């Protein structure tokens, strides 16, 4: 049922039949276990007309499934499907008054659907097993979800994280957009964000890396629930994901629990990731801009492609 890639007494790397890559590091000097799921999909994989989608999906995967967070799924489901259809209509509507009417209807149906859901249940369940530091982040190439938990709750944690990926329901879609906009506005006031966007715009012109991960305001104002669902169905599959566990647990006792939980996830064919052209910049290119209150100097060098044997070494060198 597994293919082993690397192994020693404390570290094991292997793959389940469904393609999920598993990394286990047994470290009894740690007081608990740190658990991560990583999906090989980030902002570079989202449509250019729906920027911020990968990050928004990260937020929505805390909202539960048809079991977690569902007080009465039979009543919530038709309302949820109606909300999806209304967002499809909104995306095709250009008249301002007509859009306002559709948005009003989305509000009404969302309020009705909220009667049958508890969107914070996943977070509450993690907290209930002693989980701490529940969080996630979206990068250009990956999206990661993580928290720490007591080792004796290993099976429960694995069950919750695997269930999270089984029939997720993106409830409170409209309300969560306010949180994303708060984050967007916070970055607008952050000098380092302006600097990074300027630098990446120069280094990666014509590449998805030049886009800000959180997305453009015009796309955030026109959320596309159907595209978010399609993005999830395309990339969030076990053969495109990894499970990482580090800490005070027994590797051999944990393997059957992983098979029992994450082994149930169904693999699906993956599309090829879009390949963007990259152009190495010429020797000694220089740019300047007035972006903040303090002078800053950034120096960038041509590197190696993602996955190159020297990538990790360059990452370490960059941190020194």
PLM regions: where:
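Bacterial N-terminal signal peptides
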Residues: 1-3
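Metal-associated gating/positioning segment near the N- to mid-region
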Residues: 48, 60-72
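Active-site recognition of the HExxH zinc-binding catalytic motif
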Residues: 51-63, 315, 319
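Solvent-exposed, non-transmembrane alpha-helical starts
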Residues: 46-48, 155-157, 174, 307-310
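M16/insulysin-pitrilysin zinc metalloprotease superfamily fold
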Residues: 64-66, 147-177, 320
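Non-catalytic beta-strand/loop surface segments
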Residues: 5-45, 69-152, 186-240, 251, ...
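Short amphipathic alpha-helices in soluble, non-transmembrane regions
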Residues: 159-164, 256-262
């Amino acid at each position: 049922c597994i293919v082993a890639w690397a192994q020693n007494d404390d570290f094991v790397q292997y793959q389940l039949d469904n393609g999920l890559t598993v990394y286990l590091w047994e470290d009894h000097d740690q007081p608990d276990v740190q658990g991560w799921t990583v999906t090989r999909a980030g902002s570079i994989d989202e449509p250019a007309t729906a920027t911020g989608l990968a990050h928004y999906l990260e937020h929505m995967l805390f909202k539960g499934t048809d079991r977690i967070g569902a007080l009465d799924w039979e009543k919530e489901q038709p309302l949820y499907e109606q909300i999806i259809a209304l967002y499809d209509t909104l995306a095709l509507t250009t008249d301002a008054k007509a859009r306002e009417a559709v948005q009003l209807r989305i509000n009404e149906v969302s309020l009705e659907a909220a009667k049958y859901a508890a969107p914070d249940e996943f977070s509450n369940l993690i907290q209930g097993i002693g989980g701490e530091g529940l969080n996630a982040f979206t990068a250009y190439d990956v999206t990661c979800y993580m928290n720490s938990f007591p080792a004796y709750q290993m099976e429960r944690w694995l069950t919750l994280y695997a269930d999270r990926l089984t029939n997720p329901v993106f409830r409170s879609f409209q309300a969560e957009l306010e949180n994303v906009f708060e984050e967007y506005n916070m970055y607008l006031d952050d000098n380092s964000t302006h600097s990074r966007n300027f630098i990446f715009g120069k280094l990666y012109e014509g590449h998805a890396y030049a886009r800000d991960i959180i997305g453009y305001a015009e796309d955030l104002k026109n959320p596309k629930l159907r595209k978010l669902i399609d993005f999830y169905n395309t990339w969030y599959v076990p053969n495109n994901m990894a499970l990482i566990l580090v800490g005070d647990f027994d590797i051999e006792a944990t393997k059957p629990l992983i098979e029992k939980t994450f082994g149930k996830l169904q693999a699906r064919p993956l599309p090829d990731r879009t390949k963007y052209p990259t152009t190495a910049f010429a020797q000694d290119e220089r740019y300047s801009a007035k972006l903040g209150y303090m002078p800053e100097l950034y120096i960038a060098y041509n590197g190696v492609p993602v996955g190159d044997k020297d990538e990790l070494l360059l990452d370490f060198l960059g941190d020194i």
